[in-house]
Amino acid sequence: MVSRRIYRPRDLFSLMQSTLATENFFISAYEIGIVDNFPEIRVQAEVSARENRVRRFGGEPEILISEIYDEILKKHPQLSPATVKKIIDLEIQMEKIVLYKNARGSCLFEKAISDGCKVILISDMYLPSVILKELLTSCGYDISNIPVYSSGEERYSKNSGKLFSIVKKNENVDITSWIHVGDNVHAD
């Protein structure tokens, strides 16, 4: 349904780094060290958060963005919680900037809606569903009455099939009449 204007998802962190380096972002001199290596710090924090999730709870390494930034705070205690909140907000804002409505996905979505199909959106993503809805809305989708599931919130992925089981149960849908459209042959 959406695509990014960047080559790899992690390129978002390089874009964030440029913004973090501006005077307008108000990172103190004490906190500035994070800017120089932000893309690597952000990637490693996500890896650590996933590993810690599995080590502590077992199961799948599905996490939320807050857990990623908790890892950054652990390794960079000089950051204030207020700065971390601003960086999380920046990441979400940057996602809005790089995301755009995918023509093929949009056509399929609109066709399903116009045909009266029950549409449910499922994402393997560390962002909570409320933020996913915000991102989709900013791309021009009307999803006001459409359920959105995030693997991070549910703690299960599409790849394992467990996220689909949760959706099936919660939405009371018959799996034999289910049509799933995705962009990843392995996960979808």
PLM regions: where:
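Substrate-recognition element of Asp-dependent hydrolases with the DxDx(T/V) motif
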Residues: 84-137, 148-149
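Short, surface-exposed basic-aromatic patches at helix termini and helix-loop junctions that form
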Residues: 136-142, 169-172
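Catalytic cores of eukaryotic secretory-pathway lumenal/extracellular enzymes that build
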Residues: 153-159
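Asp-based phosphoryl-transfer active-site loop
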Residues: 1-10, 14-17
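Short catalytic/ligand-binding loop motif for oxyanion handling, primarily in non-cytosolic enzymes
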Residues: 1-5, 48, 52-58, 67, ...
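A metal-dependent, Asp-based hydrolase signature
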Residues: 16, 23-90
